[in-house]
Amino acid sequence: THLWLAGLVYANIGYWVENLFRLVSKGVLDSRNQIFPFLFCYTIAMWALYLALGTPKKARWFARRMFEGDDKKAQLHSQIYYFVVVFLFIFFGEIIVGTLFERISGQQLWNYSGIPLHITQYTSIPTTLALTTGVMVLMENFFTPLMTRIQKMPYKTVLRLDYILGTLIVADWLVMMISINFFKVQPAYWSIQF
């Protein structure tokens, strides 16, 4: 339940990060195909990263801690390992998800072709570096304090937030997926061009 709520917080952060990127690169803020300001894919990504890798200074591979000790050398090795694995996860993840999604739905959700050092339309070195750096900062400086704060909340409050927010966010995501995959329409609830 605590990890679920943390994932929903990350879904909101992902929504605003994507909108910030779109504002800077295209001068637009939009709904990101959602009614609510949450992108469920970031919940899934945060769970995968945490369950597989832990946090940057205490990196692991699932249950196995990669670098023993809490000295600076172990932490540095841990951070380098974490950065490289996250970079590869994002780099190949965007290619795989973008390719599969476009093949299945016939819809293109993003295109990095206009960005220097793009590898395919789905990924580029600058975006992957930026996203990896963002993950490093969030997982090292935000994740543990967030979990501590959530764990201090009354259990029933966490459970209610999980059910209410989780139901709304997953339903919103499913509406988007059905709209794109079956009706071939990306739901555009609102957009502001600057």
Where are the regions that the model predicts?
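Aromatic-rich, lipid-facing transmembrane alpha helices and their immediate juxtamembrane interface loops
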Residues: 1-194
